[in-house]
Amino acid sequence: MSEIRLFVTTTEKQAAAVLDVMSAIFEEDDYAIATMEIDEKRDVWEASVYMMTDEEESVRSRLAQALEVEFSHLPIEREVLPDVDWIAKSLEGLAPVRAGRFVIHGSHDRDKVKPGEIAIEIDAGQAFGTGHHGTTAGCLEMLASVARSRPVRNALDLGTGSGVLAIAAWKLLHVPVLATDIDPIATRVAADNARRNGVVTGLTFATAPGFHSTTFSTNGPFDLIIANILARPLMKMAPQLVANLAPGGSVILSGILAEQRWKVLAAYNGQNLKHARTLWRNGWVTIHLTR
Ligand SMILES: C[S@@+](CC[C@H](N)C(=O)[O-])C[C@H]1O[C@@H](n2cnc3c(N)ncnc32)[C@H](O)[C@@H]1O
């Protein structure tokens, strides 16, 4: 699923007014977030709605309706953002990847696993997460370090993709893990991967956008929440994510470009989480926060 941006181009003052309208209509959505930014090359302002959803047409019509009163003269433009081609990215590289105690390998590399390593077998396929991307590797490394420092009795992997992080958490911690994704193909692939890795109980899969499912209250609150999604949805869902975190719990966030980390930290500091550690991998950051 690609990230789509619907936006209007205007002056700074008018962009701020448009942003107010956008924020009001998308306040309750998990998958759409409104923001404004300057395009320095053209010296114009853009008020945008970013989303990862199949419901672009419905978002567009709600937006058009809301802008029709005061801003109908501003055309709604559209951009497909290139940095979320998860499936193409999951096909990058096939050699085993090592992070923390984990080695993620394809079925052709079973003999490369060394004694003492926690092996996870994932073949590149229809969902993101072979371990090659800096965000996945960062989460694996952070997971190993959090497990050394804090007791974890259950975990949530939000945006599970191939299921790699959920399987890693289960193999490392031996605790119940809930794994969810907005994309039903991902949850099916993740469940298949779990079976291939010998995980038959203790790992639950569900398809849900953000926290919109009763499965979170049934299985939570969680001592550990891992969310490798994207900076904007992570900021948007900060209040719900923290509401599902157990007292003393840990959060691992990734999918964040280095330059976006301050905004993400500010959103979670605003929910009373404290920064514990940041890891950098290929321009991406993975952040550990605690309650
Ligand atoms: C970068 S991939 C991460 C996959 C895997 N967890 C990993 O670390 O390699 C992000 C995943 O989050 C899912 N996703 C995006 N927005 C979501 C949302 N609002 N709620 C749940 N899942 C979401 C995508 O479908 C995708 O599978």
From Swiss-Prot:
Subcellular location: Cytoplasm
Top EC class for this record: transferase
Protein's GO biological process: methylation
Main location: cytoplasm
GO terms under cellular component: cytoplasm
CDD domains, per the entry: AdoMet_MTases
Molecular function terms from GO: protein-lysine N-methyltransferase activity
Residues annotated as signal peptide: none
Listed EC numbers: 2.1.1.-
InterPro entries assigned to the protein according to its UniProt record, in alphabetical order: Ribosomal_L11_MeTrfase_PrmA, Ribosomal_PrmA_MeTrfase, SAM-dependent_MTases_sf
Role summary: Methylates ribosomal protein L11.
PANTHER family: ELECTRON TRANSFER FLAVOPROTEIN BETA SUBUNIT LYSINE METHYLTRANSFERASE (PTHR43648:SF1)
Family per similarity comment: Belongs to the methyltransferase superfamily. PrmA family.
Protein name: Ribosomal protein L11 methyltransferase
